Amino acid sequence: MKFKFGVDSFIWAEDFKEKDLWIIEKAKEIGFEVVDFAIANPYTFPTEQVKAELARVGMDCVCTTTLTLETNPISPDEEIRKAAVAAMKKCVDICNTLGSPILGGVNY
């Protein structure tokens, strides 16, 4: 296995949006091989645009996310637990689309 050196998008953008696509090329320019996308909101993350930019620039990625009070999988509120499962499924879909081999982060 080849070790790759990466950078987290969170150092530039707390909630990655389409306007932040420049980060991918910037990461490549300064010597990184991988971008770790901190997915703050899987419903607004620009998946297709990120996929295209990664391909254009020639970068790999991994993904992370952080669950919130509204997406807490151990909440006593059933609707919040359902929202947690839906958000995690959406994050997994994003990972699959982008080719990320992992989904890390604060997922508990």
Specify the residue positions occupied by each region the protein language model found.
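N-terminal pre-domain/capping segments
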Residues: M1-S100
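Active-site-proximal loop/short-helix segments
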Residues: V106-Y108
